[in-house]
Amino acid sequence: MKIGLFGGTFDPIHIGHMILMENVINNLDLDKIYVLPNSNPPHKLENKKTALNLRLKMVNETIKDNPKLEINDYDYRDNEIHYTFDTINYFKKTYPNDEFFFIMGEDSFLDIEKWKNYKEILKENLIIFKRYSNKNFSLISKINQVRKYNKNIYLIDNIALDISSTLIRNLVKENKSIRYLVNDEVINIIKEEKLYVWFF
C-alpha cells in the first residue's frame, strides 16, 4: 500500500488538515494516511499543549467517517521525543511491503537543515504542501536542488483557506465563533472541556 504519514499536535485538528489530507490522497493516489498526533514534538517542547487524550478525542471525532484516515499511536505511545527520521524508519521496518510518504509544510521543508538526520530524510518520499506566500520562489528553488538526488519529492497546493490551530485557539479565547473551521464534535469538546481559554 501507499501510505502517507502526517504528524502534528492537532491542537485542535481543523478543516484545513482534512482538506489537505484529502488533496494529498487524490493527487498521489494514496491508500491511507496515518495521522500521528504528537506527544512531545521536538520543535514544540516549551509550548503549552492540550492534554493528549483530548487532542486524540478531537482527531478521532473528525476522521472517524473517512476509511482512508487512521490514527496511529507511534508518536505518543511511550511519551518519548520522536524525531521524523526515527518515525519514518520505524514504519519502513515495521511494514516493509508498504511505501511511505512523509507529509510536511513548506516552512518545515525550508528549515529542514535544523532537523535530526535531515540528509537522510531528504532521501525519502516527501510530500510538501505549499501556501500562497512570498516564500514560493525559495521553496521551488530548494525543491529543485533536492530533486537532483531525490526525484520522489512531490509539491502539493494547499487548497484550504489560511486556517491554523493558532487561529482557532485565539478565536476561542476571544469568544468568537469557530463554526465551519472545525467539525461540530470538536466544537462540543472545546466547550465541554473549556479548552483554549488559557492560551496566550
Model-assigned labels for residue ranges:
Residues 1-200:
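Nucleotidyltransferase catalytic core that binds NTPs
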